[in-house]
């Protein structure tokens, strides 16, 4: 009995740790290992408030090519049905080359690696090796039309400004930051205590407010899967009701919906 209890405690602890790690950001090693599925619509949800409908597709940012082909076809179909596509795209936001470089270095100092550019390519040595065999999500493989679709995201400049306001002082760069090439492994001092705020919290609130207040009536959202943990409750607080898919934060019953 003692051994069984010990094993059960270990299993529960493992599951709790896995959940916490997954809740931080979609593109961690555990997220790829545990959530990389072939069907991008398995966790699709539909939210309705009056005559307004939001279709939310929780995305995996690193997957096999076929995954993104399905998303691309779905978005094309929905546009033909009159839906507006809202997509995730974290831009730099700097207005000069010098400012863009500084923002890029500050972002790396927060998240610990160079996010932009060769995300899963061999030349980017800062990207973990386990990501190399996958394809990174981009505008082309998901079929995003930047002229028609809506970029529903903040900029690195806006996020850095919020973090610096929160800590009441600037994020300081050091010689190590300038000496370490962007695509090299990052071993400088960091500000990882602001990782969650940068990757999730501020952007989740931005997306939630945009979806709740937009005048568009038929919307498809493609966004990193873990953003749902804050966006879905915000939609419910905004009186949206789940009409398709599953959500585990609130007991709510509606037609063809299972929640627990």
Which ranges hold each PLM region?
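Positively charged n-region of N-terminal signal peptides that target proteins for export
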Residues: 2-11
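Bacterial N-terminal signal peptides
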Residues: 15-23
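Structured, acidic catalytic/metal-binding patches in enzyme active sites
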Residues: 28-198, 202, 208-216, 222, ...
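Active-site environment of divalent metal-dependent phosphoester hydrolases
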Residues: 63, 229-230
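Alpha-helix capping/helix-boundary segments
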Residues: 91, 227-228
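Phosphate- and divalent-cation-binding pockets in alpha/beta enzyme and binding domains
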Residues: 210, 230-231
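Short, solvent-exposed mixed-charge patches
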Residues: 258-260
């Amino acid at each position: 009995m003692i051994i069984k209890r010990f094993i059960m405690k270990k299993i529960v602890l493992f599951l709790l740790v896995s959940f916490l790690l997954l809740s931080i950001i979609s593109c961690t090693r555990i997220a790829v290992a545990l959530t990389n599925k072939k069907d991008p619509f398995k966790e699709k949800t539909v939210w309705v408030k009056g005559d307004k409908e939001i279709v939310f597709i929780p995305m995996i940012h690193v997957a096999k090519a076929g995954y993104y082909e399905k998303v691309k076809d779905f978005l094309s179909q929905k546009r033909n049905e009159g839906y507006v596509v809202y997509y995730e795209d974290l831009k730099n936001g700097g207005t000069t080359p010098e400012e863009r470089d500084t923002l890029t270095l500050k972002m790396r100092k927060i998240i610990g690696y160079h996010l932009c550019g060769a995300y899963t390519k061999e030349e980017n040595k800062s990207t973990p090796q386990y990501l190399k065999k996958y394809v990174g999500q981009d505008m082309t493989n998901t079929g995003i039309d930047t002229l028609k679709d809506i970029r529903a995201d903040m900029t690195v400049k806006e996020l850095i400004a919020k973090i610096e306001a929160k800590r009441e002082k600037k994020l300081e760069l050091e010689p190590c930051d300038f000496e370490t090439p962007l695509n090299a492994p990052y071993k400088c001092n960091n500000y990882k205590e602001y990782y969650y705020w940068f990757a999730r919290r501020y952007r989740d609130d931005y997306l939630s407010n945009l979806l709740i207040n937009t005048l568009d009536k038929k919307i498809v959202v493609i966004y990193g899967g873990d953003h749902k943990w804050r966006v879905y409750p915000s939609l419910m607080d905004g009186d949206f009701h789940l009409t398709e898919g599953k959500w585990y934060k609130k007991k709510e019953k509606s037609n063809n919906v299972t929640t627990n």
